[in-house]
Amino acid sequence: PAPLAPLAFILRMRTVPLRNLGACIAPDNSWLFLQGIETLPLRMEKHCANSLAVAEHLEKHPDVEWVRYPGLKNDPYHELNQKYLHGKGGSMVVFGIKGGAAAGKKFIEALQLFSHLANVGDAKSLAIHPATTTHSQLNEEQQRGAGITPELIRLSVGLEDPADLLEDIDQALAAAK
């Protein structure tokens, strides 16, 4: 109908560009964003060093089935990591805990320093059990198709002292038995 045409046009002009381009960022937020960009290389050095320490520690731990981190020499993506990331494996470490989903849930609940959050790349260390959180709406077959297994734990390693991170992981692995 003709009377609704202007309203439809107005709504389209407000929603489509917002969806495609995003909202304008506030000046204060822009300043904070720029401050973060300035220190990003320093933070990434610490993220990568901490992640490698965590991955190497987990690789030797008796309660861990497997570890995936491109900074490890035996990781299937190690060569690509060397080529494209100059040997810096990033801050994500994924591992399989012995005991499956039940152990994974206990591990997450026992962590004290790591936060139980789904976002990644924070200055704080984060941990999640994807099978019971981010991918819980999928059945087991769909989860496996997405690369999510019952024992999988995903860590986003932050900037804390590596000794503190390893201590928290060790106590949580002990509690998960």
Region spans (language model):
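Active-site C-terminal subdomain of aminotransferase-like
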Residues: P1-M92, G96-I108, L113-K124
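PLP-dependent enzyme catalytic core of the Aspartate aminotransferase-like
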Residues: R43, A102, E109, S125-K177
